[in-house]
Each structure stands twice: as structure tokens, then as C-alpha cells.
Amino acid sequence: AAEAFRKKDKEAFALHSNRFLEMLRDVDELLRTRPEFNFDKWLTQARSWGDNSEEKDLFEKDATALVTVWGADGDPLIFDYSWREWTGLIDGYYLKRWEKFYAMLQDHLDAGTNYSEKDLPQTHGRESFRANDFYSTLGDWELQFVSTPDKVRTPITQGDEVETATRLYKKYARLA
């Protein structure tokens, strides 16, 4: 998708960005077959430590921040430090971020404007949390995600892991 964007090839950009988003959905589906890869389990455990709704919400917020922005509200310095491959987190957080990023790039393609991250401020080898207008808006969304209690829950497990893995293997083996 990045190469297609640089070449201003809208058709290839759509193909590759959609393929990547589909892959994230498929990874989330595969992880949903195993209880140990579940974001809801993490949040449920965090909420269990609270004695009242206020404490439960705070523990959920802290547990969410730990695996997303890794820090307090504002300007975390090492966001994504604790990335987890968990169902619910991929579909509910990482996929949505990528959708926003690709939509922003698509807007630039449609408008015929350039976009480059070459000179953006860096923190630990990646774009800073609020490196430009897009990342600032994305940062607001990320902090809102962290602060929202009772996030959409995913079933602890869903689907057969062997069937799902076999189907996805066949799907992606043909792309190699």
C-alpha cells in the first residue's frame, strides 16, 4: 500500500490497503478461537479488582492504557510499547487506527495532494504521538478509546481453531 501511495496508484493502493485490513480481521478471527488471546479477558480481570463502578472503570482504563498508549493521558512517549495480539484489541483498536490512516492517505490521493512523514518529529524511531494534525486527531481518538468504560466485548472463544487456521492458511498460501 505504501509503494502504491507513493506512485499515486489508487487502484493498487485500494487493493493493498484493503488486503492488509482484511488480514487484521482474519488475525482477530483466528485469535478469537483461543481464550488466552482475548482482550475482554484482560479487561474483565482488571475490572474485578474494583469495589465499585468508579474503581472498576479506573482499572479498565489503566489496563487499556497499558496495552495501547502506555502511559497517562496527554503525550505518551512510548505508545504501542506493549502491543498485544489479542482478539478484540486488534479488531476494536488497531484495525480502526489503520482504517483511519488509510482513509487519510486515500483523501490525499483523491485530492491530488502530497503527504509525507519524512520530516515528522520522531520518538523512539517512530512518529511522535502528536506529530501532525492527523496524528493529533488519532491521539485524541486513542485516548478516548482508553477512557471509554465497558468497551464492546468479544466472546471468550468463538469458532474452531483448527478449522479457522486451516481455512486462513489456504487463503494466504495462495498469496505467497
Over which residues does each language-model region extend?
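Catalytic domains of carbohydrate-active enzymes that cleave complex glycans
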Residues: 1-176
